[in-house]
Amino acid sequence: MKVHLDRTSSGFCIGVQGTIHLAEEKLEELDSKLYCLGDIVHNEVEVKRLEDLGLITIDNEEYNKLKHAHVLVRAHGEPPSTYKRADSNELSITDSTCPVVSKLQRTARLLFELGFQIIIYGKKTHPEVIGINGQCADQAVIIKHADLSVPEETDPIDFTRQTALISQTTMDVPGFYILKKNLESLFADRTDAAEQKSTHSWKTIRDIDITAEMTGICPLPDLVYKDTICRQVSSRNAKLHDFAAANDIIIFVAGKKSSNGQVLFNICRESNPRSYFIADQTGLQDEWFYDNGRPVGSVGVCGATSTPMWLLENVAHSIEQTYAG
């Protein structure tokens, strides 16, 4: 049995790497406690490792009561209200918001200030989406289902307003464009036939287009979209698909809360039905590794952007020691 560890399309993305590195630095240099608002990463094993080093995870209620303390803002980012509370409670903020998320927040804020209705492709309760929505005074329309199958998600849309479609950075690219197409049809259905072609043709925009609108040089169309999905994350999809197909079985390692983990695991399972989701090596099951009593030929170990490489290495080592010996 050969055990293959995916080192090219698994493990922390740059944003999470920066957050973990900053947390470790602060834990080493601070004499006082370091708090983190929410799980620093959606991986229970990594959270426990950092908590063992002294990191204290708190929720919003605890954060609002905290005073004169050091707080880490994780890669997902936070809404403006979090920073206002920090000022009023004299909190010292270490901001590790992912640069890709920071750019997205700025885009959402500028479009909202220009009067656009903001539609976010994402999950309403995901911390990144909460942060983006905060840039829009919590008035964004949030749609998780690209097929528009949930009326409660589309009911808040005002079809008379200028509208901008953006996305949570970790959503799937095909889903974003399916949503765009379905929204085009929905907007067309809600308007007069005479207006459909001219007013309700969706146009992609760049940062320079937003600047041009702000300065009055070139007004934006009524309906615009900006693909804000992180390509470092989405580019892993094809690589993981091929990796999964090249092995007899796949052991996918991720936290239960990881949105990206669910997306990537589904990609693995579509490519290889013998794909199994675990949090760590304790989740391994003997029957996965045998065909008619004989060991399988190859095992692929991979994971999410929130899965640390050290954990993937531990899982691969455990498989080698237990099943490949």
UniProtKB/Swiss-Prot annotation:
Known pathway: Isoprenoid biosynthesis; dimethylallyl diphosphate biosynthesis; dimethylallyl diphosphate from (2E)-4-hydroxy-3-methylbutenyl diphosphate: step 1/1; Isoprenoid biosynthesis; isopentenyl diphosphate biosynthesis via DXP pathway; isopentenyl diphosphate from 1-deoxy-D-xylulose 5-phosphate: step 6/6
GO biological process terms on file: dimethylallyl diphosphate biosynthetic process; isopentenyl diphosphate biosynthetic process, methylerythritol 4-phosphate pathway; terpenoid biosynthetic process
EC number: 1.17.7.4
Cofactor(s) required for function per UniProt: [4Fe-4S] cluster
Binding residues for (2E)-4-hydroxy-3-methylbut-2-enyl diphosphate: H42, H76, H126, T169, S258, S259, N260, S306
Membrane-crossing residue ranges in chain numbering: none
UniProt GO MF annotations: 4 iron, 4 sulfur cluster binding; 4-hydroxy-3-methylbut-2-enyl diphosphate reductase activity; metal ion binding
Family, as annotated: Belongs to the IspH family.
Name under which the protein is recorded: 4-hydroxy-3-methylbut-2-enyl diphosphate reductase
Classification of source organism: Bacteria, Pseudomonadati, Chlorobiota, Chlorobiia, Chlorobiales
